Amino acid sequence: RSTHCISSAASDVYKRQLLTGTPDRIKGKDNKIDYYNASMFLKPDGSTKMYYKIHLVPFAESIPFSNYFSFLKKLNFGQANFTAGSEYTIFNLDGISFANLICYESSIPKIARKFINLGANFITIETNDSWCGHSSGVYQHFEIAKLRAVENRVPIARSANTGISGLILPTGKVNNKIPFNEQKVTLSSIPIKNVQSFYTEYGDWFAVICTLISLITLFFGWLQKRS
């Protein structure tokens, strides 16, 4: 809880609301301790609200299917063995709702869509990209965040410990971009628009229908060729 204390003190001293990443642990059933990759939203009055990462990185943060096959828990690849969260938490900033994606979650479209449908007006992303080094992964991860902004027509504020950071507008344009491996503080005004995109409302149905039409067309083409 030392991270919690430091972050809470910073929020209290500067009288600002603060969003930060932190590990957390909770005693669960049978006194078992569950560890989480979390984000914490603090207010100057000392109150906090937590979001626990729902989709963990396979083999880095957890072993897939280990809850169903106990022998998998004995495998050790140096993973963190976090417990996946289950609640899509919405934060409130002076009457404006927002949600936070943790690292790898920004690569999964349905998570961002779920948050927007729950009322989030914008999205933040906290990410540790240091594991990529100075590779193409850093830039690819940032470009993926642009897709989430355009898909849902919402602004995204992205903060990476080694960069790339910046404010991504609903059009995909980036404001106040901080390059890789550059220490900098930037202030951005986040435009709030309550416009629901086609993808936010209908999800992947368009892609599913197109796929089905393609498969049906191929099937009848194959039948015609055989006859």
Set out the residue ranges of the language-model regions.
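Short beta-strands and strand-loop turn motifs
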Residues: 1, 21, 125-128
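Single conserved hydrophobic/aromatic residue that forms the stacking wall/gate
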Residues: 2-10, 14
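Catalytic-core segment of enzymes that process non-peptidic bonds
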Residues: 11-97, 152-183
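A short, polar/proline- and glycine-enriched secondary-structure boundary/capping micro-motif
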Residues: 30-31, 59-63, 109-113, 135, ...
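C-terminal beta-strand edge segments of enzyme domains
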Residues: 63, 142, 148-227
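Active-site beta-loop-alpha substructure in enzyme catalytic cores
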Residues: 73-146
